[in-house]
């Protein structure tokens, strides 16, 4: 989670990476986010909590999430945007990403990641 805690100075205000993520989503016109929370993405969920311009859809499983985002993109013509945690959260998206890819459906998927120091140590999730 530490990589979302970096702050940059913008004028006299420090801006967290999570705030920049939310600002980037808004700048790209994202108004709906399909998401499933988990430890490695919890900081992003905290930043999105008070954001009322982006509707968050929280299904009960990542596979439902990716297929819902696919259906959303097909029915609205907008990009389906997803946010999940690392490990199984990410791998549960694979079939839905492949389905969307075969039909040229636009999806953007974000996943959490374990801290850099834990990579390569079988730490795929919390």
Regions found by a protein language model. Name each.
Residues 2-6:
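Aromatic (phenylalanine/tyrosine) cluster motif
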